[in-house]
């Protein structure tokens, strides 16, 4: 974590910014959702997991007049609380086998965190299931990947990469993580405004830009967008695509955290290869709506920016509040008929999973929003929902990923779905 927070034994604690509070809250809450998702089977008694904090810092901050736990302590505490609940509610108990890697390039940070963990009662676990590494994340990563692979075949792992800027984590390294493990997820902080301000032909061949695989032509193409209407949105949109393509992530959730302290925006990018992981992160943004924004529209294809359109129409900053929910539901209701009709013309219907998976990356829409609107269209007689076994679901509120959306044989004269 370069440039903002510093720790040293005997020195005052760094002051935690409001945007970092939001990130830490997301980290802790997502851990809880993640574990709950993977332990839904009542007979399950064990889960293997590795949690990696690639820019751990010293583990303690000051906010106002109080000490505040940093990400290492919050991650440890979240796992402990979840294991206690699982052990108390499962007849045969539960063993949550979580290993932790806390990595930082600054020796003072490592010494500070080690001291904090000892004071908090974790001394016996250091070197057993809590591993502290004094190294750059990229240097420590090969050993971490080897550890995860040895731990089991599922290779479930969460990488929290809370870098201060935008170039400390090479995109090739994220590509390696996502490509070499079976079930990894990456949460990456990315200082997009700082990158946009840095972009110029003069800086085109710096190592920082090479780390995120932007070459001279890429930089030139991005800087050429400057000056036109909505240029910042255009550059952000191009960077979305670039990061997804370079990391190989099938699913990503790009949302903004605004830093009042620096007056700049950061991305919190969730990268994974699993549809369910993406959906859960999207739902979490709706629940923790105080600090998060999405720059774009309300429905599907919300990040596909058209420079010919008036920026004031549909491209306003999107907050995760009640008004945003209403806008999302209205937009999805407007877009779904065309999407379903086109799929039915090409084939025998559209799987709910295919509909969501092929459209979820560029949208704040979650499966809950989608299912509510599908049920509405069905109840209006605009579509039929068919279960995997071929039976109809005329009234069921449970719309599954394997259900198929088909046009009914008869529709109203004013059908939204057309012919």
Stretches found by the model and what they are:
Residues 29-144, 365-376:
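SAM cofactor-binding core of SAM-dependent methyltransferases
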Residues 140-153, 175:
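Short amphipathic alpha-helix with an adjacent loop that forms part of the alpha/beta core around
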Residues 156-168:
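A short SAM/SAH-binding and catalytic strip from SAM-dependent methyltransferases
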Residues 166-176:
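A short, conserved alpha-helix within the catalytic core of class I
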Residues 182-194:
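Conserved beta-strand signature within the Rossmann-like core of class I S-adenosyl-L-methionine
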Residues 204-260:
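A conserved mid-domain beta-alpha-beta active-site/ligand-binding segment of alpha/beta enzyme cores
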Residues 267-277:
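Conserved beta strand-loop-helix elements of the APE1-like EEP
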Residues 284-419:
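C-terminal target-recognition/interaction regions appended to catalytic cores
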């Amino acid at each position: 974590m370069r440039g903002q927070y510093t720790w040293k034994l005997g020195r005052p604690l760094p002051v935690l910014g409001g945007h970092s509070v939001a990130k830490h809250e997301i980290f802790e809450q997502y851990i809880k959702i993640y574990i709950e998702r993977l332990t839904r089977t009542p007979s399950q008694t064990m889960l293997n997991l590795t949690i990696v904090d690639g820019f751990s810092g010293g583990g303690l901050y000051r906010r106002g007049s109080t000490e505040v736990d940093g990400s290492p302590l919050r991650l440890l505490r979240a796992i402990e609380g979840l294991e206690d609940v699982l052990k108390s509610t499962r007849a045969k108990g539960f063993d949550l086998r979580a290993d932790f890697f806390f990595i930082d390039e600054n020796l003072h940070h490592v010494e500070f965190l080690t001291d904090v963990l000892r004071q908090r009662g974790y001394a016996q676990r250091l070197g057993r299931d809590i591993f502290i590494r004094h190294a750059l994340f990229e240097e420590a990563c090969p050993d971490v990947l080897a550890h995860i692979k040895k731990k089991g075949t599922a290779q479930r792992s969460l990488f929290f990469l809370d870098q201060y800027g935008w170039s400390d984590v090479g995109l090739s390294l994220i590509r390696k993580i996502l490509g070499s493990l079976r079930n990894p997820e990456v949460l990456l902080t990315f200082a997009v405004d700082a990158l946009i301000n840095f972009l110029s032909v003069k800086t085109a061949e710096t190592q920082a830009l090479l780390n995120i695989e932007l070459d001279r032509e890429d930089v030139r193409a991005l800087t050429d967008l400057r000056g036109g209407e909505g240029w910042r949105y255009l550059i952000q949109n191009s960077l979305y695509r670039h990061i997804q393509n370079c990391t190989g992530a099938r699913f990503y959730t790009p949302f903004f955290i605004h830093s009042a302290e620096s007056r700049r925006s950061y991305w919190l990018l969730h990268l994974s290869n699993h549809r369910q992981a993406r959906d859960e992160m999207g739902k979490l943004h709706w629940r923790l709506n105080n600090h998060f924004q999405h720059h774009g529209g309300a429905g599907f294809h919300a990040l596909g920016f058209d420079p010919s359109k008036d920026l004031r129409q549909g491209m306003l900053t999107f907050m995760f509040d009640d008004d945003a929910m209403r806008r999302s539901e209205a937009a999805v209701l407007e877009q779904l008929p065309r999407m379903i009709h086109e799929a039915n013309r090409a084939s025998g219907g559209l799987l709910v999973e295919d509909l969501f998976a092929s459209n979820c990356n560029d949208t704040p829409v979650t499966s809950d929003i989608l299912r509510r609107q599908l049920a509405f269209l069905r109840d209006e007689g605009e579509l039929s929902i068919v279960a995997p076994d071929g039976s109809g679901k005329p009234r069921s509120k449970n719309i599954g990923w394997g259900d198929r959306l088909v046009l009914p044989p008869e529709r109203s004269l004013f059908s939204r779905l057309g012919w």
